[in-house]
Every structure is written in C-alpha cells, then in structure tokens.
UniProtKB/Swiss-Prot annotation:
Function: Involved in urease metallocenter assembly. Binds nickel. Probably functions as a nickel donor during metallocenter assembly.
Gene that encodes it: ureE
GO molecular function annotation: nickel cation binding; unfolded protein binding
SUPFAM superfamilies: Urease metallochaperone UreE, C-terminal domain (SSF69737), Urease metallochaperone UreE, N-terminal domain (SSF69287)
GO cellular component entries: cytoplasm
Region (Disordered): 134-211
Protein name, entry field: Urease accessory protein UreE
Pfam families in alphabetical order: UreE_C (PF05194), UreE_N (PF02814)
Organism of this sequence: Rhodopseudomonas palustris (strain BisB18)
Amino acid sequence: MIRATSVKGQHRWSEAAADTVVLDFDDRHRRRTAMVGTRGLQFLLDLEHAVALRGGDALVLEDGRLVEVVAAAEPLIEIRGSDPKELVRIAWHLGNRHLPTQIMAKGLRIRRDHVIEEMVQGLGAKTVEIEAPFDPEGGAYAPPAEPSHDHAGHDHAHDSHAHHDHDHGKHAQHDHGKHDHAHHDHAAHDDHHVHDEHCGHDHHGHGHEHK
C-alpha cells in the first residue's frame, strides 16, 4: 500500500489532488492509519509524528501525488453570549470541563452535548445546533504553528475549510452527539485542543489504527 509521509499546509500547494479524504476532528489527528479517498484511492498515512491536519491541507504520497484533506461537518452547538465578558465566563467553564472548544469571532463552538447545552443556557447564553467543521483551539501545550513551510509532524494554523471546488463524494457520517466526558489517551494520535484531552466518542470509518 502506498504511503503518505508528509503534509503540505493550506495555500502551500496548487497541484491537482489525486483524491480527497473527508475527515472529522478526531480523524484529522492521526500519525499512522489506513485511509480511503472519496474516489477510492487507498493509502497508509505514515507520519513521523501525529499532526493536527486542517481542511485544505494536502497529504503527500510517496510518488508525489497529493490527497486533499477536507474537514467533515459535525453536529455542533454554537454558543452566543450577550457580551464578551459572558463568553469568557462560559469559555472558562468549558475549559474547566476539558471540552474542546472552537473560538469564533462572536461565539464559541463545541460538540453537541445536551447536558452541556443546558449548563450554558443556565449561564445566560443562547445556543444553536449546527452542522459544521470542528476546529477547536490547540491548547497551551500544542506545538507552535508553522505555516510557512511544508512539514511532516508539525501543527499549523489556518482556516478549517477546503479551498478547492470539487465533488467530495459520499463519506462516512460521524455522530459525536452523545458522550460522557470521559478522558481517553489515544495512543495513535496526540490531543490538540483545550487542556489536550478529548471527550469520549466513537470513531467510524477511515480505516483502522496501526501501531
């Protein structure tokens, strides 16, 4: 099986992609795993270190071909406060519970969880259930961003949406709506979010982890 051994960051490549992989937040945090593109290309992601992939990145195959990474839409809750102070207070409570949180210009996004949604509403915020790519903060202990060069094994900061127009085809849906906030140590990939821990959730599709 051909391997993908390095990553090109968003806006650092312009070639036509040989295929596309549509991945949710968890599946974008891998070091070594088998993947299948939307057009059927099978390959092994085999990086030196786990990388926080973003939508618009490209995985570089051994033969030089590229596979574009697209961030899959996930069931999320968007939190909107009446003022910045209220949002900061809510963000503190979310961080205190080790919840991955995406910071928006005028709100916060977390994975859909009705218990947390009720807590946030009790703090005075408004919530809206949405389907969107999830790109939470990397956390204080995440490696520094390195967007200026191609890399294998480094995180990078840029927008979570793909930058090419094409048909992504059918892909597995990921339902992270129900979870119990248990914290797991995923051996095959690093955590890259607030407090560097994940809430418990299932992984579906995109092959199996290889140790």
